[in-house]
Amino acid sequence: MIVRSLDDINGTDADVVTENWRSRRIVLARDGVGFSFHETVLYAGTETSMWYANHIELVHCIEGEAEVTNDETGETFLITPGTLYLLNGHERHTVRPKTDFRVLCVFTPPVTGREVHDENGSYPLLTEDATDTD
């Protein structure tokens, strides 16, 4: 069994901060469970375009609100606490937080924590062997 708190993540290489967001990667590929799990805060007033060509992502809002636009269809959705969106078709999308937007995210395949968004807003498909987490 793995037990972790956000305090365990803060200030480590699993605590990723950019101009638009902060993502604390709580479960990663090295944990060997087939998915990764993150708590991410996207900052109010920012705009972030992403395209997970190599991953499926589920995003569940627990605080704040944002508009999410499917860049392929032009559809825009208001995401509020208790609402999720699932990028099951690898959709290019843009997130525009109206307030600080706190979400819980699940990625499959799992990310390693070393990924950075490329020029298309995508993560490369990296692999990492599971390590002993005892």
Curated annotation (Swiss-Prot):
Signal peptide: none annotated. Transmembrane segments: none annotated. Gene3D superfamilies: Jelly Rolls (2.60.120.10). GO terms for molecular function: ectoine synthase activity. Keywords: Lyase. Pathway: Amine and polyamine biosynthesis; ectoine biosynthesis; L-ectoine from L-aspartate 4-semialdehyde: step 3/3. One of its GO terms (biological process) is ectoine biosynthetic process. Its EC number is 4.2.1.108. It catalyses: (2S)-4-acetamido-2-aminobutanoate = L-ectoine + H2O. Pfam families: Ectoine_synth. It comes from the Bacteria. It is an enzyme of class 4 (lyase). PANTHER family: L-ECTOINE SYNTHASE, PTHR39289. Catalyzes the circularization of gamma-N-acetyl-alpha,gamma-diaminobutyric acid (ADABA) to ectoine (1,4,5,6-tetrahydro-2-methyl-4-pyrimidine carboxylic acid), which is an excellent osmoprotectant. Belongs to the ectoine synthase family. HAMAP family: Ectoine_synth. This is L-ectoine synthase.
